Amino acid sequence: MFDTSTKAKTKDLLEGAVSPLAFLKSKLNAGSVVAIGEAHWFSELFEKITEALLAPELDGSFSHLFIEFGNAKHQALLNNYLSGETVTQAELAAVWLDSVAFPAWLHPCYGAFFERVRAVNSTRKVPIKIVLTEPSFSWEDIQHSKELAKLSAQRDQALAEGVEKQTSKCGLGVVVLVGARHILKCSPTLGFMAKHSTFGELAKHKFGEQYVSVWPHILSSELNAPEHGIYPTDQPLLKQRSFLELIPKKPSVNPYAFTCLDELVDAYWYLGPQTRQLDTVGISIPQMWKWRLEQRLPLVNERQQMVIKKVIE
């Protein structure tokens, strides 16, 4: 694990921290595809990361932000909302509540994110367009959990194709905000665990060195670092870290047992100790959506069912 003792020697401190804004601006101005890992229900971390992305210092460095928490079926609706048109909260909620992985987006930080983008777009020289790359579909057409799983497995490919299409049209860099495991550049070294290629693996193949992946610190412990910032993973103190040292919940088998950290991600974003906010108290779902979410309970797993029931009760 990362050394959190007060006796850690200065020589064991991580080096080369870059301020997030400087890092992002440099990569985006060079035309890179910057993929930032997101941890579901880590709302404070989400808000800090997106605060950096929406900062005025990055105005003009990118115009398109690709996200996974939205069904592409509702792209036009989101475009209208972000451009300032009148859209009710119940209508806008279709963007993330009609997502394949909607239980992951029930925390209000995701819906509030669109409000924040709309607000900053009113003052930006280059407004941010949010691109929903999850395959377009209707829940009415999903009759079995296997159909949902098949659709979910298509998300990485759809995201990679969407980003490739945009980069071919525009010289600006592109930002991708997606679940952290999706940004990994390699398949598991234990082959039987690789169900399909991650977005990161596809992006590495398509964009080469122009693909830059940034893993966020999602542990409740301190990192042996002198300051918050983004650290390159090719330095010795990070390069040899195990994948298991990046995640709070340890699987029984390390799927990347023989892979160095710098082969998985290019940089590590440290914003201090983080915790998952799983408390559903205060989460408000528009009434018209409660019945719809209840109808989907048979299609999701037990853990997701538990979260949904807590939110709609």
Regions picked out by a protein language model, each given a short descriptive name:
Residues 1-313:
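Compositional signal for N-terminal targeting/processing segments
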